[in-house]
Amino acid sequence: MLVYLAEYLTRFHTGFNVFSYVTFRAILGLLTALVFSLWFGPKLIERLQLLQIGQVVRNDGPESHFSKRGTPTMGGLLILAAIFISVLLWGDLGSRYVWVMLFVLGSFGLIGFIDDYRKVVRKDTKGLIARWKYILQSLAALLIAFFLYATAANPGETQLVVPFFKDVMPQLGAVFIVLAYFTIVGASNAVNLTDGLDGLAIMPTVMVAAAFALIAYLSGHAQFANYLHIPHLPGSGELVIVCTAIVGAGLGFLWFNTYPAQVFMGDVGSLSLGAALGTIAVLVRQEILLVIMGGVFVMETLSVILQVGSYKLRGQRIFRMAPIHHHYELKGWPEPRVIVRFWIISIFLVLLGLATLKLR
């Protein structure tokens, strides 16, 4: 929004040209989201407490989690508000990338909100029926996938980038829709499964978003894109604003979500943030890289799939409890140790993912 105002004011003073630089607006976007989260966080927590919107804790979970019962949840509303305000202020509203991301965050945030509302307000421990949640996620993801395929302006927007191989970038055609669908829905649910400990999901989300900010910036510049053998995607620089807004909002939320948490993000936060990461990966053609950098999310998801599959096929469980972070809790690891070690793994995987841009 302010880009247009700055463009007009440039007629009177050339100093306003600085707002045309993506990097400058990205920094302002990060700071805006961060300050907004830190400023309104306490107010939201107080409001959630007054409304008695508290976390529902499973009776069959680790005993250490029983103390979390009643902790304010749906804090993802704070994250979404910070991102929306930041992007609307500093993003180029003429960019389709911006509106795609706002739609993703809004639609998946709404699905998560309905799920949280049923759990904590209507006291329905199951929340939104899994079948309906999946149907709604699928509808939103397919809308995005079809839109991106139909509006692709150059061949690079539907190619698949394969890490470690600089000359392997197959044209996907209509398969793009299928890959985009599974990436968005898969990432959304993966982050949701990871969000089981204080700060466990938000920090890897911040790290992956920061990495994608760099990738989006490089993809938007022909010289960098050609040098790194990645698709040149004109206009993708606007995704940098979205990514840094996620980073700022996430760090601000972590201030209150770090152990012991004062607030949880709920499904309204985890489903929307996961879908956002998946969509960014699709937009910059780095779906495989998301699997690497978001390895913690993949690990959590696979642990659930293996646990359920093993129990149904063999009648035996592989882990003491799934997702896998609960397994380590039941082994006796203190919650902060599990969290920080998963963060360390995430740092390593994000750096590995960034290294693949050059290791080709």
UniProtKB/Swiss-Prot annotation:
EC number: 2.7.8.13
Compartments in which it is found: Cell inner membrane
Xref: CDD domains: GT_MraY
GO annotations of cellular component type: plasma membrane
Transmembrane segments: 26-46, 74-94, 97-117, 134-154, 168-188, 199-219, 236-256, 263-283, 288-308, 338-358
Keywords carried by this UniProt record: Cell cycle, Cell division, Cell inner membrane, Cell membrane, Cell shape, Cell wall biogenesis/degradation, Magnesium, Membrane, Metal-binding, Peptidoglycan synthesis, Transferase, Transmembrane, Transmembrane helix
Organism of this sequence: Shewanella baltica (strain OS185)
Catalytic reactions of this protein: UDP-N-acetyl-alpha-D-muramoyl-L-alanyl-gamma-D-glutamyl-meso-2,6-diaminopimeloyl-D-alanyl-D-alanine + di-trans,octa-cis-undecaprenyl phosphate = di-trans,octa-cis-undecaprenyl diphospho-N-acetyl-alpha-D-muramoyl-L-alanyl-D-glutamyl-meso-2,6-diaminopimeloyl-D-alanyl-D-alanine + UMP
Protein name: Phospho-N-acetylmuramoyl-pentapeptide-transferase
UniProt GO MF annotations: metal ion binding; phospho-N-acetylmuramoyl-pentapeptide-transferase activity; UDP-N-acetylmuramoyl-L-alanyl-D-glutamyl-meso-2,6-diaminopimelyl-D-alanyl-D-alanine:undecaprenyl-phosphate transferase activity
Membrane topology, record value: Multi-pass membrane protein
Coiled coil: none
Main location: membrane
PROSITE patterns: MRAY_1, MRAY_2
InterPro entries noted in UniProt: Glycosyl_transferase_4, PNAcMuramoyl-5peptid_Trfase, PNAcMuramoyl-5peptid_Trfase_CS
Position of the signal peptide: none
